[in-house]
């Protein structure tokens, strides 16, 4: 088994999908959480000067959260079984990533610093919030319909096996639901899917014991 080190700030943020994949697979890794004060000195050492970044066997470096997530999903069996299934897992995951990305941009400052006040007035917060709300209006109905296409939406996104797509549904909506508890009130299939992820035999212990952060 390779050795893994996941580098990211002490947030769930863009690295949480990767942490959830490690938990779902039961694979050990070094969860290196970088303090914002350390980041300035480290930034130029990182590929693309960004995190998260996954190190494998202290030799290979993979930047970009979704590239890391797809790699781990393929390695651990949480991607599709064929190209068509992989495409479905990918587009569902990317749709939820769009929601998470627009949400984080409302609160993101720079160099890993997040503004925890809700809403955070950074001079253009109204524009960013409008963009996030429009993204939700565009994507959530589509995700509900997409889920219903598989077994009536009563299992996971790909059927009876949990995949990266289901984990993205959970982690991408975690903070938005904290801000607006009724966000999924019109999407019962998505609500139920998040419940299945939460009660999964590998995910339930992880979600109860993980480091508690605001984002």
From Swiss-Prot:
One of its GO terms (biological process) is glutathione metabolic process. InterPro entries: Glutathione-S-Trfase_C-like, Glutathione-S-Trfase_C_sf, Glutathione_S-Trfase, Glutathione_S-Trfase_N, GST_C, GST_superfamily, S-crystallin, Thioredoxin-like_sf. Keywords: Eye lens protein. One of its GO terms (molecular function) is glutathione transferase activity. Lens. Residues 82-215 form the GST C-terminal domain. The keyword Iron does not apply. Residues 2-80 form the GST N-terminal domain. It comes from the Eukaryota. Disulfide bonds: none annotated. The keyword S-adenosyl-L-methionine does not apply. Belongs to the GST superfamily. S-crystallins are structural components of squids and octopi eye lens. Contains relatively little if any GST activity. PANTHER family: GLUTATHIONE S-TRANSFERASE. This is S-crystallin 1.
